[in-house]
Amino acid sequence: MIKVIERDGKVRLPFSRGILTRSITSVGVDVDLAYAIATEVQEELIRQGKKVVTKEEIRNITYQKLVEKGFKEEAKRYLFWRRFRKLKIPLIILLGGPTGVGKSTIATELAFRLGIRSVIGTDTIREVMRKIITPELLPTIHTSTFLAWKELRGTVTGSPIIAGFESQVNAVAVGVNAVIQRAIKEGLNAIIEGIHLVPGFIKIDYEMAFMYMIVARSREELEARFYERTRYSKRSAQYYISHLDEIMEIQEYLIKKAREYRVPIIENVELEKTISTIMEDIMEKTVEIMKKKGLDMLEEPK
């Protein structure tokens, strides 16, 4: 049995092809091929007569195997994410976007690939606030975002739909900002997703916090997503489709805010493409941040 240790030799765990396969698939390699590469890495260690091996040695052999098979970009990403994990820097990913666009699915997949345990939906934060704050005190949080305008009091300037939405966002953002600050303070990785993540309302004063606006390419595409959603949701597709005008108006507002605050806008057409776009963007920005600190995250192993 091959044992894996840290540099200080304190931790000894059995080598796992499954864990290595997951690491390789996280950079976009098909699972069958990733398992084959993990097997080759294990065979290489056996051939070298290794009984004890460091994580760095495994990383270097895996990198070479990826390069040999023509996966140069994947090898680069693999190297980056392994090194980034080692730095133990808290990573905060924020995924905003309208109802039904696929934010939860994206968040779950990102969490799996990056090994992030904490995935928080802003709907959950809103639900907690509903238990604390009565409808009489703050009525707009006690309904759907696209119906919050019906609970507004007084005169409204501009679109009532957006005014109601902003009222709910303004309240929920307090909880969201508290969650972000706690994650940073505790040194925890976190992915937060939800319609309430609106640029300008969410405080992002941490260099390793990355925000993305996920949107639907068209009204028809979003409508199709609602029908797909009925497979695991108690609410019928018709509930959302009957309010599609309001939802699309909110999407246009979110796009406008994202452009204003230079938040990347991603049309969620294919899950794999969306995930790759986000991970690639985080990598590129992190490489630049670390370069300013004298660290080369993409230096090839010797």
Curated annotation (Swiss-Prot):
It comes from Pyrococcus furiosus (strain ATCC 43587 / DSM 3638 / JCM 8422 / Vc1). Belongs to the 2-phosphoglycerate kinase family. Pathway: Thermoadapter biosynthesis; cyclic 2,3-diphosphoglycerate biosynthesis; cyclic 2,3-diphosphoglycerate from 2-phospho-D-glycerate: step 1/2. Disulfide bonds: none annotated. Catalyzes the phosphorylation of 2-phosphoglycerate to 2,3-diphosphoglycerate. Involved in the biosynthesis of cyclic 2,3-bisphosphoglycerate, a thermoprotectant. Its EC number is 2.7.2.16. GO terms for molecular function: ATP binding; kinase activity; phosphotransferase activity, carboxyl group as acceptor. The lineage of its organism: Archaea, Methanobacteriati, Methanobacteriota, Thermococci, Thermococcales. This is 2-phosphoglycerate kinase. InterPro entries: 2PKG, ATP-cone_dom, P-loop_NTPase. Keywords: ATP-binding, Kinase, Nucleotide-binding, Transferase. It catalyses: (2R)-2-phosphoglycerate + ATP = (2R)-2,3-bisphosphoglycerate + ADP + H(+). The keyword ATP-binding applies. Its cofactor is a divalent metal cation. Residues 2-89 form the ATP-cone domain. PANTHER family: P-LOOP NTPASE DOMAIN-CONTAINING PROTEIN LPA1 HOMOLOG 1.
